[in-house]
Amino acid sequence: MRAMVVDMNDKYAVVVNKEGQYIKIKRKAEHRLGYQVELPDRVIGFERRTLLKVVSVAAALLIVSSISFAVYSYNLPYSYVNVDINPSLEIILNMYNRIIDVKALNSEGEMLIEDSYKNSRLDEGVEKIIDSAVAQGFLKNDEENTIMLTVAGKNSRKVLEIKEEVESTANKVLNDDNVVSEVIVENIVLERREEARELGIAPGKLLLIEKLKEVDPKATTEEYKDKPVNEIVKTIRDIKKVPNENNRKDDDKKVNNEPNKPLPDRKADVETSAGVKENTAGPDAGIKPVNKTDNAKPNVGTDINNKENKTVSNAKIDSGIDKGNKDSKPNSNTKINNDVKKDNKDNKTNSDAKTFNDVSKDNKNDKADGNAKINNNINRDNKITPINPDNKFSSGGSKDDKDNKHVDSKDKMNNEDNKNINNGSCPQYNPYWNPYWNPYWNPYWGNPKEKEDMTKQNDEWFKKMQEEQKKQYDEWLKKMQEEQKKQHDEWVKKMEEMKNTEKMKNPYQENKIEKPKEAEKENKPDRPPEPGKEILKKRC
């Protein structure tokens, strides 16, 4: 049987026989394209049946390999979730977040293991574990409970997703079971899990023990290895609450005469400084002392029978001096409020000192240097309160010094004005509300009535503005609606007029007049005869 060579390769040649079949044969040296050759008895070729067999075998192998890979990947551990209460469990997950296995890390954890955990979702497994822990009494309603959850895995993004899912499911289950418990969720590295596994402890408990060692270096892993999570957390918090010995050193070093920080005025001092009343004995009468000294607690301890009361310059004084005090020398940079008693003889303050003095009867020499601000708390029988806004000097007179007047006429104040000194007309002076160095100072803090009036005025103004704006908006809206309605009505009328007239017709048909066909024929010119045709007709 002969065939023609169509294609050739290094090893094979393709020929076509008379029937049109393509046959593959071995190439020989005499084979040339387009030549006819004799076909051998044995021909190399693929039939349809053999091809189907090969394809089916390949497909079967592919299906088997894919199934085996899916089974292998399904059973391959991908991430781990540890649940620590006192029973410790480890949930092993695959890459699809399905539970492959649940292992108990201690004897109590074996009580919570069930066969139904396998092939279930993570949230279902966590829910079953917490429910069984509540049912078996590991989590109680009356006690403080703590659940430690640790997540470890190969993919950090997936670890964070599992962390959020586990925390939300745990809180949901605890709320459904009416159990109050603290849920602590942490993510760890796989190396830390292996370290905890070598020590025979849960990873979450290992983290808590390391935190306990930071607070208490004496703590050991073996000591807290078998203790529940709740107890470890409680010990950490108790140790943090106890103050250190280093924090007490500053308190022991403090001396009564040298406070570290200036203290604000007490409520009792404010009440006594505000009590200025009329004096019935006359304008030149002696100054009587204030007897309200029980509530005034001294910040600086002073000895009895001191002869002189001296304060160093640039000192702010806040102290209570008992009867018979004659000499008191506090250190500089302190605030002392002097309630001076009967037997004080010399009360001398240097420049730039701010004092609040309650002056007694027998004070003979009460001298204050320049640049001093003095606010004297005077009893009922006092009538004159010397105030020096120019910071020159201010003194309280005695019986022997009636004729000596060191105060200008501008600096005198009436007792009736002093009555209302704290009723809103003049706020009580406080160095902590000084606007020059306190950025949060507000002058209305001392006057709540003025603040209420201002808020009322603001509210009334705001309401008026709202009403005016609403009226303006309503008027504008009405005008706009009327204008739009007028425009719409005009447009509708115009459209109706256009429809009724012939202007809406086709403009090409307006001037066109229909004429009868006969008239068109009459107006048409006759067609001229073709040359030669009539002659032929006549001849015929």
Swiss-Prot record:
Please tell me one Gene Ontology term that the record gives under cellular component. plasma membrane
Instruction: Kindly list any coiled-coil regions of this protein.
Output: 451-501
> Where does it live in the cell?
Cell membrane
Q: Which residues lie on this side of the membrane: Extracellular?
A: 74-540
Where are the membrane-spanning stretches?
Answer: 51-73
Cytoplasmic side residue ranges read: 1-50
Q: Which Pfam families is this protein grouped with?
A: RsgI_M, RsgI_N
Keyword Membrane on this protein? yes
Q: What is this protein called?
A: Anti-sigma-I factor RsgI7
Q: What is the lineage of its organism?
A: Bacteria, Bacillati, Bacillota, Clostridia, Eubacteriales
Q: Which gene encodes it?
A: rsgI7
